[in-house]
Amino acid sequence: MCKRVLIVFVLPLLFMIGCKEASVVAQEENTELLEEFLIKKTELNLRYSHPPADRRLSFHNVDLPPERWKIEAKAKLKEILKISEIDSGEVEELRKIEFQGVAIHALLMKIDDNLTIPAYLLVPNPAGPQKSAVMAIHGHGSVEPTIGLVDDYHHCYALELAKDGHLVLAPELRGFSTLNDLADHMEINRLDYWIGRYSQFTLVTDGFLYGNSLIGETVEDLLRWEDWFAQNHNVKELDVVGISYGGDLAIVYPVFSHRTRKIFASGTMGSFTAIFERCYNAPAHCIPGILEWMDRSDIAGLNVPRPVVLHYGELDTPSPTNASASYNETVHGSLEELKEIYKAFGAEDEVQLIVTPGKHHEMDIPQLLKFFE
């Protein structure tokens, strides 16, 4: 009886197990066949690149008097970036510290009821020489290394300028450090950018839905801070310095400023055509549709006749591991286009190229201090 029960129950079970194992083997064999069948990258042609853009308002593409070109190109850039007439917001001082002989003031500006943005004002020792006011614009990372918290590729340049006698305003940019998520105080919502972990860069992409760009909104913030700087510290003119994304902003924001005296732009100004597909830059640099009208050389040219330094580290070149690569093959062509614009205004000698030997994507403090002397 027991044998019969065993046969009745065990044999079907063994049969089912055998069938399942056979099915798995067959499925694995079929999957291997399917995998071999699938199209491989090696069978494709993957050399895509966008064709050359029209650049309809680039200086070398238009037949306009220089002054007329400047008016029309500035108006188009203002339209693309959606720069509006703005006033500085209310600013409060949170606290103050003395650091390496410099007084650093922590500031907050109210943009609207849903957003405040920070900045640091660095006041030099009053016993030393008093030099120009400076807007110091950080790159990807945060503002804190510019004022001396740590030494990274910024090399504490806001602090070094203040120690040299400059009155320095160093704003935190949207998308970075304490502003790395503009919806951080809302449950679930995320408008993040440089958060140091997995990110969809929603601060950038959400803005695109409304026709805005992160760089355009940041330019408006810098103009607000400049107005506050002028009104509260009697700043009639100022110098501007930035590196990387801050270098982009050091070229773009002064186009809409009437107070800028000199510009030191590090790690920027090659053509837009290379910064994403060739140099693997992050999306904050993007100005949607810009190449339909102009390139970086034209934007920089809108600052004519202001003296401008374009600075690079000799080793900041394209490679599989370099996500800046600002000193790329488009730099010298862009420089020639910029010089052409400055020459048309009788200011060709006001454009300088400085390449620091043996350096990567990093600020050159001695060259910066010398230029702003």
Model-found features: residue ranges?
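Glycine-rich active-site/cofactor-binding loop and its immediate structural neighborhood
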Residues: 97-153
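Cap/lid segment of the alpha/beta-hydrolase catalytic domain
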Residues: 129, 136-220, 275-279
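Mobile cap/lid helix-loop segments that gate and shape the active-site cleft of serine hydrolases
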Residues: 201-202, 209-212, 224, 260-305, ...
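Alpha/beta-hydrolase fold nucleophile elbow
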Residues: 233-244
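N-terminal targeting or regulatory segments adjacent to alpha/beta-hydrolase or S9 domains
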Residues: 19-103
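C-terminal catalytic histidine-bearing segment of alpha/beta-hydrolase fold enzymes
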Residues: 336, 340-373
